[in-house]
From Swiss-Prot:
This is Transcription factor Sox-8. It comes from Xenopus laevis (African clawed frog). The gene is sox8. Residues 98-166 bind DNA. It comes from the Eukaryota. Residues 152-167, 231-247 have a biased composition (Basic and acidic residues).
Amino acid sequence: MLNMSSDQEPPCSPTGTASSMSHVSDSDSDSPLSPAGSEGRGSHRPPGISKRDGEEPMDERFPACIRDAVSQVLKGYDWSLVPMPVRGSGGLKAKPHVKRPMNAFMVWAQAARRKLADQYPHLHNAELSKTLGKLWRLLSENEKRPFVEEAERLRVQHKKDHPDYKYQPRRRKSVKAGQSDSDSGAELGHHPGSQMYKSDSGMGSMGENHLHSEHAGQNHGPPTPPTTPKTDLHHGGKQELKHEGRRMMDNGRQNIDFSNVDINELSSEVISNIEAFDVHEFDQYLPLNGHGAIPADHGQNTTAAPYGPSYPHAAGATPAPVWSHKSSSTSSSSSIESGQQRPHIKTEQLSPSHYNDQSQGSPTHSDYNTYSAQACATTVSSATVPTAFPSSQCDYTDLPSSNYYNPYSGYPSSLYQYPYFHSSRRPYATPILNSLSIPPSHSPTSNWDQPVYTTLTRP
């Protein structure tokens, strides 16, 4: 907005700069300045032109006498002096840019701006542009006629001078448009990408390496709700993903994407519909063992989605890096963490196999590194579990008899309603949940072993 008066007026009121130049820059094609501005700047240089009618007294409210003066100026003005600004930023290039012919408003604005800038150098160009636009809309057809005629003459002259002229939009503007396009493209590309991650392995079990990486620095994997920056840019995509995740839940509940589902929604939405499931249908998807120290690996969101292929990686004793990048740490780690904070919400925080491991508290399995499927009553080592897991060797159908789904007679035998989360059982749950976030290694520490033997034996 540093235009013709940049050398003589202090920018006093920067308000409205962007919008006020819109009238002018619409028909301008070269520089960010209006032709009125750039020519105005150049017009101070040729002697005898700049202060041509500056002696007339004018009111700041632009009365009708100004319009008459401007039209008089236009009638006697030599337009051949105008086209090239003498000292413009990019005015004198090797190949000068051909501007579009001015329309009637530009003719009016250029002459009036020059006149007013000479008269009132303190007027900010933005305010000037705004007022010129308002005045132009108030002009009658009769008052506009001289400007329209001048614009028509300029158009004909322009056509003569540049017979093969083609309008090319300002390069700066096109870069801006491309930039915003690429921005939105990146945003759109980013969200489907993370959606692909989440739907691809959204219900896959959570590797403890992801839990560690989240606690350590949250540096890889798709963005999770705890780490996603709460910006407007991601907000729309996140809402969209939330609806998409909900749509997936409604669609036969293929995979519940916990990263985009608020835990409060989950408690009402998922739990209210959870009775519709056959709990035995879930059993083939339950992980047999995760990594020893963090049974939160068993906190997989166990839905009926066939994610068997991703479990063998998760079930190994060592975290598989391929799986860790592919699986969604967002899906269950957030629900695990919220499980640690709010143990009373009866969602899929910790899976049955984990509670079976601890509620039976069977000391016969001395190898706590493997957690190898005590539900199957077999000491399969963690090396063989990946091959054994997707198959139906480990069938939990006999578990209700061994108090697997219903360890306490007072509670309904539903997959997700564990007494550990009720207030009467809170003392049993809190040592587990507190210990989940503590041990970072693959071998249990003493502060975890003790609660298993002392507080979690079966009543």
